[in-house]
UniProtKB/Swiss-Prot annotation:
Entry similarity comment: Belongs to the pyruvoyl-dependent arginine decarboxylase family.
Subunit: Trimer of an alpha-beta dimer.
Function: Part of the AaxABC system, catalyzes the decarboxylation of L-arginine. The arginine uptake by the bacterium in the macrophage may be a virulence factor against the host innate immune response.
Protein name: Pyruvoyl-dependent arginine decarboxylase AaxB
Cofactor(s) needed for function: pyruvate
GO terms of molecular function: arginine decarboxylase activity
Superkingdom of this protein's organism: Bacteria
UniProt-listed GO biological process terms: arginine catabolic process
Keywords assigned by UniProt, alphabetized: Cytoplasm, Decarboxylase, Lyase, Pyruvate, Virulence
SUPFAM superfamilies per the UniProt record, alphabetical: Pyruvoyl-dependent histidine and arginine decarboxylases (SSF56271)
The EC number(s) this enzyme carries: 4.1.1.19
Site feature: Cleavage (non-hydrolytic): T52, S53
Amino acid sequence: MPYGTRYPTLAFHTGGVGESDDGMPPQPFETFCYDSALLQAKIENFNIVPYTSVLPKELFGNILPVDQCTKFFKHGAVLEVIMAGRGATVTDGTQAIATGVGICWGKDKNGELIGGWAAEYVEFFPTWIDDEIAESHAKMWLKKSLQHELDLRSVSKHSEFQYFHNYINIRKKFGFCLTALGFLNFENAAPAVIQ
């Protein structure tokens, strides 16, 4: 029996950072720092599959903090994510990394919710930062990106933008920072019927 395309109906937001004095080339921050960031984000035992940024309307009001979802996690499962994540080496001049994910929801001409879009933000800083700087920069760039996504599609804003961010001041040789949405529950659209 055929089934249609799959779409998420429950998501969570999370974030994590990691740093290390050890790493393997060519991207030493990917080796130990990335795993540590996944651990802090509580998604270290998933197989991570990143994808782009379109959100079905069924996710509206169904994006929860990660701590509300961990009891449903399955070791070794595939976790589809929208992730802003990057690593850096302090010898390249990066002392801090900030990441963020923003969400916008659009409405049609009748005011009905169409669905949403996400945007990702990553920024490297030559000095240490604090949460106020990380949050303000994330909101500034994500707001611009989210508005672009709406304008590009000629869609009106349905509700307030949502923002999630994270940052790290790197104290070791290598660092990694991530902010992510993870998708847990799914349904299927009606299958296509071609006459």
